[in-house]
A protein has these predicted regions:
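C-terminal peripheral helix-coil segments that are non-catalytic and often amphipathic
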Residues: 1, 88-96, 131-147, 166, ...
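Basic, helix-initiating cap at the start of DNA-binding domains
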Residues: 1-25, 29-41, 55
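Amphipathic alpha-helical segments enriched in hydrophobic/aromatic and basic residues
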Residues: 22, 31-32, 43, 53, ...
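Short hydrophobic/aromatic patch on the recognition helix
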Residues: 40-50
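Hydrophobic alpha-helical connector segments
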Residues: 59, 73-103, 156-160
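Amphipathic alpha-helical segments used for helix-helix packing
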Residues: 85, 100-121
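Hydrophobic alpha-helical segments that form the core
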Residues: 104, 109, 154-173, 186-192
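All-alpha amphipathic helical-bundle segments outside canonical DNA-binding/catalytic cores
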Residues: 124-128, 146-162, 181, 185
């Protein structure tokens, strides 16, 4: 029995590099050569570790969603209130619009627009990520209702869907070049609609 050669690269770093590239360029515009260069690996290592570009993309999308959800959950736990968490998320969009760096939007939203209509596997991954995101916002809304910041007469499930829809729209606006004041105004309307 022969033992295969050990991997000569960190699979997590390679996955992270691929995720950033897909996020910046999209799935179709990212070539295998782009991926190999960004990941710092050979073609044979790529196929051995990831199988195909599509399989790699599935892993990248899952990594993105899991990282985003974990970050939001942690922020919610640390927040002084559910409403403060929601306001902080909105404020981060204003900061993103104000930054001079590349505005890539949201990988899940970008992927929905690019692939979800014609790729059932990707559509399911995006739907699962969106459902998890709605779960975090529903938890924030329920907490804010217990704290008296959002009326209990409003359905948490509906408000969480509203917040995720707003977040998706705002991320798209930021990616499209909307100025910080416009994003700030829309965020303000979003928060007001909760109360």
């Amino acid at each position: 029995m022969t033992v295969g050669r050990p991997r000569e690269f960190d699979i997590n770093q390679a996955l992270e590099a691929a995720m950033r590239l897909f996020w910046s360029q999209g799935y179709e515009a990212t070539s295998l050569q782009n991926l190999l260069k960004a990941m710092g690996i050979s073609k044979s290592s790529f196929y051995e570790a990831f199988g195909s570009k599509h399989q790699l993309f599935e892993q990248c999308l899952t990594l993105y969603a899991n990282t985003l959800i974990a970050s939001f959950r942690e922020d919610l736990q640390k927040a002084k209130s559910g409403l403060i968490f929601i306001e902080k998320v909105m404020k981060s969009l204003v900061e993103e619009a104000s930054s001079k760096g590349e505005k890539c939007g949201c990988l899940m939203v970008n992927t929905t627009n690019e692939l979800a209509q014609r790729d059932k596997i990707i559509a399911k991954l995006v739907a699962n990520g969106t459902k998890s995101l709605q779960g975090v916002f529903e938890e924030a809304v329920r907490r804010a209702q217990k704290e008296g910041d959002i009326p209990v007469s409003k359905a948490p499930e509906v408000l969480s869907s509203f917040l995720v829809s707003s977040l998706i729209g705002l991320k798209t606006m930021v990616k499209g070049g909307a100025d910080a004041q416009t994003i700030r105004d829309v965020c303000g309307v979003t928060i007001t609609a909760l109360q």
